[in-house]
């Protein structure tokens, strides 16, 4: 079974980048080689701030989307600083699952 990671990088200009992958070390190296995401290419080097592993791709992608679209920078930095990323991702997935059950 594959393992998936949602990861958060800090770019050289102090901005944050969030993505998902199956190989965290390789993806970080790809970003830092300038062959990663378009966003990070001009903001090298990047540094890994946090990562959370998941058993399935959908959960990793959902948490990436939530981090990018539902949190403001201050919230993102607070979760990272207080080591609450995994806890909040799990809460988000549980809430998402409850909503899906009620919609069916």
UniProtKB/Swiss-Prot annotation:
PROSITE patterns tied to this protein: GIY_YIG (PS50164)
InterPro entries for this protein: GIY-YIG_endonuc, GIY-YIG_endonuc_sf, UPF0213_domain
SUPFAM superfamilies linked to this entry: GIY-YIG endonuclease
Domain GIY-YIG: 2-79
UniProt-listed Pfam families: GIY-YIG (PF01541)
CDD domains: GIY-YIG_UPF0213
Protein name, entry field: UPF0213 protein YsiG
Organism: Lactococcus lactis subsp. lactis (strain IL1403)
